[in-house]
Amino acid sequence: MNLYLIGHDYRYAAEQMLLTLFPDERPEYPDGRPTGDRAELRLMSGTKVTTVTCVLVYHGQTANGRTSVPNGELTDPAEKDRRLQGAVKRAFYRAAMGIGLPHRPWGMLTGVRPGKLMTPLLAQGLNDAQAARQFERQYDVSPARADLVVRTAHATLRAMESLGEKDVCLYVGIPFCPTRCAYCSFVSQSVEKSMALVPEFLQALAREIAATAEAVRRAGLHVVSLYIGGGTPTTLSARQLDALCTQLAAAFDLSALREFTVEAGRPDTITADKLQVLRAHRVDRISVNPQTLDDRVLDTIGRRHTAQDIYDALRLVRETGGFAVNMDLIAGLPGDTPDGFRATLEQVLALASENVTVHTLSRKRGSNLMAQDAPIPDGAAVGEMLDFAGIVLPRAGYAPYYLYRQKFMSGGFENVGWTRPGQENLYNICIMEELCSILAMGGGASTKLVRPNGGKLERHIDPKYPTEYIANIDRICAAKAELEAFFQ
């Protein structure tokens, strides 16, 4: 679609709304007179208000959108940019509703973290109903989504109250998987092709662990959560997992640790000896992720395991004991149906895991789904799946405790973590709501530095490919040595 920005250059805001409303369109910025399918977004500054208008032409239909912001609310430069970008989105959205686009569950919101908009409303004293109504009016969010974000915001507020200024989380990324799932765009390395890289990668990781631990010690930080993810960390052998956990315990002061999570994920990598190693190192949370319990769908997405493998892996976890278990599901997988998803969720509930995370399929660039153009359930079918989850999970004693959104999600929905009472994963809340710093190590790991007052945020990302990670380990460790300065 052609985009014409008149009187401003808020490209990012215009493009985010374009991708939200018209996910199959890509932005173009032609010169000359406006033609074709297009959005003309004009900003006009008056004496009292600044107005944004949108003329939208799409498939022979034309509609207009308009919104204004009082100039008295635009005195701070940073706030001015934020408000005017929001006005560009709002005018575009209103025009799109004028040509009859179906209402989207999250209305005009385009961001990853809707909870960051809700938490301040509750913190300033609004009750749940008031906050939900304001959210609906301001962003045209559906009542069901407004209620959902209110409930997750309460979990955020509880987590905020429990964190001290010096509290941080640690993340360790292991970028290896036994096979690559069709929906995945993370550049994890197939062990069949690159097992030879694992020992050298772990040697480099040990150096980064040491450098990070020294920065943590010098800054006087307290590690409250440790999360090993990937990839699939349990791709490593029991001996390698033991060595990694030993290094972490020796390098960091873990006396303040409140949880230790390992994203086992794939049942074909979970063995009794690995579980015993993890329990010996105080790991108390683990994921066993079916995504679906339909063998036909599992084969379609390249998982290379069966539903029975999930049952067997979970039995091993329960026999080992001491783990809170999360199980991931994905709504909208190729070949799945609302009935199939219902059957999977009912079977998962019968397994009584402490957490259930319901993801919506995101058609990520770089995934095999995008390359193959695989047929997937439409937004209406995905909506049925999520509506069912939203009914049966609370009935089974689960409450939503974190949520986030991604680009190219089927139906424009969301990912939601559900928990039994008292079983929330603090790390998930902290990273999604940016409550504290996440110090990350390993392949593709993203360090996120957050000021306690929320006023500053920095990101540092390690290389994804193991070969690049190994080659750049000197630079990576040097950057970790500079972390201390952020906390001064």
Sequence positions of predicted segments:
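Short beta-strand motif preference
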Residues: 52-54, 172, 286-288
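Conserved non-cysteine loop/helix-boundary elements of the Radical SAM core domain that shape
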Residues: 188-389
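Radical SAM enzyme core and accessory elements
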Residues: 1-124, 128, 205, 421-488
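Beta-strand scaffold of nucleotide-dependent catalytic cores
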Residues: 173, 287, 355-359, 429, ...
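N-terminal [4Fe-4S]-dependent radical SAM core
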Residues: 100-103, 123-170
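Solvent-exposed beta-strand sheet faces enriched in polar/charged residues
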Residues: 30, 42-44, 173, 229, ...
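A C-terminal junction/extension of Radical SAM enzymes
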Residues: 32, 36-37, 366-441
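Canonical Radical SAM [4Fe-4S] cluster-binding loop centered on the CxxxCxxC motif
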Residues: 167-202
